[in-house]
Amino acid sequence: MVKSSLQRILNSHCFAREKEGDKRSATLHASRTMPLLSQHSRGGCSSESSRVALHCCSNLGPGPRWCSDVPHPPLKIPGGRGNSQRDHSLSASILYSDERLNVTEEPTSNDKTRVLSIQCTLTEAKQVTWRAVWNGGGLYIELPAGPLPEGSKDSFAALLEFAEEQLRADHVFICFPKNREDRAALLRTFSFLGFEIVRPGHPLVPKRPDACFMVYTLEREDPGEED
């Protein structure tokens, strides 16, 4: 089960790297995301004076390169890099909320693909947000470029629990560029957690020759087997 693996992700050497360097470096890495999963979207990082929000993923949307052939809905990206007139934060609806997680869903024209923003509150002054695509029983997450920012370990653990317990997901996919300098370290870390490399041509991932995909299969216990 995923809970039995979460402690290992907190202590893995990849996530330990987030403590190295200063806060300025962590913020820089949080905003440098890999090329988009949708051909029509762009990612970004935003912050507020009273709260730090680390957006740890590109603005993923239901597009032809990410498990859907429906055009990505127009977005106004925080930081002024969007060219649309609609701000996704204004039209998003709350899907799930507790004392730590706040998950919102952005409207799309495809009822089979859902764009989620999973915000984890670490402290009163810091939040980490993962943007993901929920499609066909799988949750798809794109790792940010560079070392994962401070706080990503705890937020990622909470995300995996949410995928298992609330979404009842069958798989959680991660992806990152094949040419990353820390590719070997990421492969070791996530393999240790139970993730497996997705081979080219897998029916559940888009054709991205520039990206490496890994998958974690969520296996739920049969209630009758607990005794």
From Swiss-Prot:
GO terms for cellular component: cytoplasm; nucleus. SUPFAM superfamilies: Acyl-CoA N-acyltransferases (Nat). It comes from the Eukaryota. The keyword Transport applies. Pfam families: ODC_AZ. PROSITE patterns: ODC_AZ. Induction: Induced by a ribosomal frameshifting mechanism in response to increased levels of intracellular polyamines. Keywords: Polyamine biosynthesis, Transport. GO terms for biological process: cellular response to leptomycin B; cellular response to oxygen-glucose deprivation; cellular response to polyamine macromolecule; negative regulation of ornithine catabolic process; negative regulation of polyamine transmembrane transport; polyamine biosynthetic process; positive regulation of intracellular protein transport; positive regulation of proteasomal protein catabolic process. InterPro entries: Acyl_CoA_acyltransferase (IPR016181), ODC_AZ (IPR002993), ODC_AZ_sf (IPR038581). One of its GO terms (molecular function) is ornithine decarboxylase inhibitor activity. Interacts with ODC1 and thereby sterically blocks ODC homodimerization. Forms a ternary complex with PSMB4 and OAZ1 before PSMB4 is incorporated into the 20S proteasome. Interacts with AZIN2; this interaction disrupts the interaction between the antizyme and ODC1. Interacts with FAM171A1. Ornithine decarboxylase (ODC) antizyme protein that negatively regulates ODC activity and intracellular polyamine biosynthesis and uptake in response to increased intracellular polyamine levels. Binds to ODC monomers, inhibiting the assembly of the functional ODC homodimer, and targets the monomers for ubiquitin-independent proteolytic destruction by the 26S proteasome. Triggers ODC degradation by inducing the exposure of a cryptic proteasome-interacting surface of ODC. Stabilizes AZIN2 by interfering with its ubiquitination. Belongs to the ODC antizyme family. PANTHER family: ORNITHINE DECARBOXYLASE ANTIZYME, ORNITHINE DECARBOXYLASE ANTIZYME 1. This is Ornithine decarboxylase antizyme 1. It comes from Rattus norvegicus.
